[in-house]
């Protein structure tokens, strides 16, 4: 009897030691694979499949996954007599047209440091335009203090911005915000904003140009 109890206790102890530790993850809960059981550890294949599911989930939640200028934005640009900036200017021309910071943010998808941008705490009434093509993007009336150190808005102007899936950070799908006319990278949008939209358009100051209202 004592030997059987000892054998059972030893087996239980070995099973407990064989269980893998839980690994932290920044994937959405719906995209995670089922928790491992029976001593089966996480595998690279499991994480790869989870990443694919996460990409699919993020793609379905984005308003658009296309990186080309939207038809609405191009139509508006043509109506205003503006050229198709996304195809008419070369990378070298953009370098000459923009400052170093503006080029890094808008054409190379960079991110400025929090609390350093020109407009992160600006409360001046006006319209925020794209620094590359002058398209009006956000009204100051939709700007709010998000506490993040970047200019934040709960709503863009019409169809002047577009969104696409951003998987530049592994296991953390995000929604990139771009100018619909010239494809300039503006920032990212999140679902933790105020009413009435519940959105937070987190935008780089270097991608904007504020035109004050009289």
From Swiss-Prot:
As for subcellular location, the record says: Plastid, Chloroplast
Concerning what turns on (or off) its expression, the entry says: By salt, mannitol, cold, methyl viologen and abscisic acid (ABA).
Instruction: Tell me the segments the record calls region Disordered.
Output: 58-91
Top EC group: oxidoreductase
Q: Which GO terms describe its biological process?
A: protein repair; response to oxidative stress
Keyword annotations from UniProtKB, A to Z? Chloroplast, Electron transport, Metal-binding, Oxidoreductase, Plastid, Redox-active center, Transit peptide, Transport, Zinc
Q: Which SUPFAM superfamilies does the entry mention? A: Mss4-like (SSF51316)
The UniProt record lists the EC number as 1.8.4.12
What is the free-text note on the cofactor?
Binds 1 zinc ion per subunit.
Q: Which PROSITE patterns did the record assign?
A: MSRB
Tissue-level expression? Expressed in leaves and flowers.
**InterPro entries recorded for this chain?**
Met_Sox_Rdtase_MsrB, Met_Sox_Rdtase_MsrB_dom, Mss4-like_sf
Task: Offer an example of a GO molecular function term for this protein.
Answer: metal ion binding
Main location group: plastid
Catalytic activity field:
L-methionyl-[protein] + [thioredoxin]-disulfide + H2O = L-methionyl-(R)-S-oxide-[protein] + [thioredoxin]-dithiol
The positions annotated for binding Zn(2+) are 130, 133, 179, 182
Q: Which residues form the MsrB domain?
A: 91-213
Q: Name one GO cellular component term.
A: chloroplast
In this protein, the active site sits at 202
Transit peptide, residues from-to: 1-53
Cofactor (UniProt):
Zn(2+)
The record's family statement is: Belongs to the MsrB Met sulfoxide reductase family.
| Record function comment | Catalyzes the reduction of methionine sulfoxide (MetSO) to methionine in proteins. Involved in abiotic stress response. Plays a protective role against oxidative stress by restoring activity to proteins that have been inactivated by methionine oxidation. MSRB family specifically reduces the MetSO R-enantiomer.
Q: What else is known?
A: Lacks the conserved cysteine (here Thr-148) required for the reduction by thioredoxins (TRX) through a dithiol-disulfide exchange involving both redox-active Cys of TRX and MSRB. The reduction mechanism may occur through sulfenic acid formation on the catalytic cysteine (Cys-202).
* Listed PANTHER family: METHIONINE SULFOXIDE REDUCTASE, METHIONINE-R-SULFOXIDE REDUCTASE B1
The entry's protein name is Peptide methionine sulfoxide reductase B1, chloroplastic
Species name for this entry?
Oryza sativa subsp. japonica (Rice)
Q: What is the lineage of its organism?
A: Eukaryota, Viridiplantae, Streptophyta, Embryophyta, Tracheophyta
